């Protein structure tokens, strides 16, 4: 069962908005054999230029669905978000099913329906093991976040793991889509 946590910034989340969000995101349930127990986090923001930004995060047991969209219309942003989430699910479903088909067993991980809405007969369930194709080991060097960003850019990576010189904790810097950088601090 999907539980919704809908927050608004510079906008009051009215009952019609809440109903629209829930109705649209509930359509994603058709992709799963059983409705997943998940907390759906939805942030609605309205900017001074009247653009509306919608962010949705749905943490699932084997997958985290996340999308954000900005447009001039809140309802259009919600529709676009659902389209993005559907594409993510279909892409992951294809990847998982291809992996299990290649191993000779398929897992009924997602719901399947063809054009007529019929479902396939029961299939054998294989072990749900994702294959790790490469392992790297390296020493974490103490540094600050600025130096970590420089190292990441120097290596041409989209993220970089390092030990924070002040806290001695393991941190991760990463490149964001907007060209800025993010920092993940571990406990």
UniProtKB/Swiss-Prot annotation:
Entry GO terms, CC: cytosolic small ribosomal subunit
Record-linked CDD domains: RaiA
Keyword check for Membrane: no
An example molecular function term from Gene Ontology annotations: ribosomal small subunit binding
Gene3D superfamilies reported in the protein's UniProt record: Ribosome hibernation promotion factor-like, Sigma 54 modulation/S30EA ribosomal protein, C-terminal domain
Knockout or disruption consequences: Loss of 100S ribosomes. Shows no change in growth in pure culture after 13 days, however performs very poorly (about 1000-fold decrease) in competition with wild-type. About 5-fold less virulent than wild-type upon oral or tail vein injection of BALB/c mice. Sensitive to aminoglycoside antibiotics in stationary phase; sensitivity is suppressed by transcription and translation inhibitors or by disrupting the proton motive force. Stationary phase cells have 5-fold higher than normal levels of ATP and NADH and accumulates higher intracellular levels of gentamicin.
The keyword Cytoplasm is annotated on this UniProt entry: yes
Cellular localisation: Cytoplasm
GO biological process, one term: negative regulation of translational elongation
InterPro entries found in the cross-reference section: HPF/YfiA_ribosome-assoc (IPR050574), HPF_long/plastid (IPR034694), RHF-like (IPR036567), RHF/RaiA (IPR003489), Ribosom_S30AE_C (IPR032528), Ribosom_S30AE_C_sf (IPR038416)
Keywords, in A-Z order: Cytoplasm, Stress response, Translation regulation
Induction: Transcribed early in log-phase growth, peaks at log to stationary phase transition. Repressed by growth in the presence of glucose, which also decreases 100S ribosome content. Induced by growth in ethanol, NaCl, and 46 degrees Celsius; stress respones are under control of the sigma-B factor (sigB).
Signal sequence, start to end: none
A Pfam cross-reference name: Ribosom_S30AE_C
Family of this protein: Belongs to the HPF/YfiA ribosome-associated protein family. Long HPF subfamily.
Assembly and oligomerization: Interacts with 100S ribosomes.
Function: Involved in 100S ribosome formation from 70S ribosomes; 100S ribosomes are probably translationally inactive. Ribosome hibernation may be used by the cell to decrease overall energy consumption under nutrient-limiting conditions. Unlike E.coli, 100S ribosomes are present from mid-exponential growth, peak during the transition from log to stationary phase and then decrease.
Protein known as: Ribosome hibernation promotion factor
Organism: Listeria monocytogenes serotype 1/2a (strain 10403S)
